[in-house]
Amino acid sequence: MGSEQNDSTSFTQSQASEPKLCVKGCGFFGSPSNMDLCSKCYRGICAEEAQTAVAKAAVEKSFKPSPPRSLFIAEPPAVVVEPKPEKAAVVVVSAEPSSSAVPEANEPSRPARTNRCLCCNKKVGIMGFKCKCGSTFCGEHRYPETHDCSFDFKEVGRGEIAKANPVVKADKIQRF
C-alpha cells in the first residue's frame, strides 16, 4: 500500500511539471502565475483592466457634481490709495496684471519644427543635421552651400585663430 501512495504522488508531480498551453488558445505555453495565460495574453488582459479602470474613474468624475465656481474663485478687491493732498490724482492698484506688463506677440506662436528640414520640409527624425545657423536640415540640405546658410564661418574661424594664437610682442631693447 505504501508503494501505491508513492506512485500516485509521483504521477501528480509529473502532471504539474508538464507545461500547459495558454487558456486563450494562442499556441504558446501558459504559466500558473499568469492565470494559465502566456505572457502576451496576460499583458493584454492587464492593459484592458487598467484602461477599464481609468475609463470608469473618468465616468464617475463626470457624474460627480462639481461645486459652484464662486466658492473657489474670489475676485481680489481693488485698492485705492490716495497720496498726499498736493497731488490730485488717485492711484488705483489692482491685483490683475495690466496689459502693458504682459507683452503680446502679434503673430501666434507656432511650434518649433525641429524634426523637419527647413528647405524641403522633409521629416528627418533623429537623423536631422543641426547647422550653426540654428536650423535642422535633411541629408541633402545639410551643407551650408545647399541651404544658403546665413552663418559667417569665415569670421568665426578668424576669431578662433586669433584667440588661439595671440600676438606676443616683446618690450623694446634699450641700447646704451
Curated annotation (Swiss-Prot):
Which biological process, per GO, is one annotated for this protein? Answer: proteasome-mediated ubiquitin-dependent protein catabolic process
Decide whether keyword Zinc is in the record.
yes
InterPro entries for this protein: AN1-like_Znf, AN1_A20_ZnFinger, Znf_A20, Znf_AN1
Write out the residues that bind Zn(2+) 1.
22, 26, 38, 41
SMART domains per the UniProt record, alphabetical: ZnF_A20, ZnF_AN1
Any one Gene Ontology molecular-function term assigned to this protein's record: zinc ion binding
Residues bound to Zn(2+) 3 are 131, 133, 147, 149
Q: Which Pfam families match?
A: zf-A20, zf-AN1
Does this UniProt record's set of keywords contain Zinc-finger? yes
Q: Where are the zinc fingers (AN1-type)?
A: 111-157
Protein's name according to its UniProt entry = Zinc finger A20 and AN1 domain-containing stress-associated protein 9
Its source organism is Arabidopsis thaliana (Mouse-ear cress)
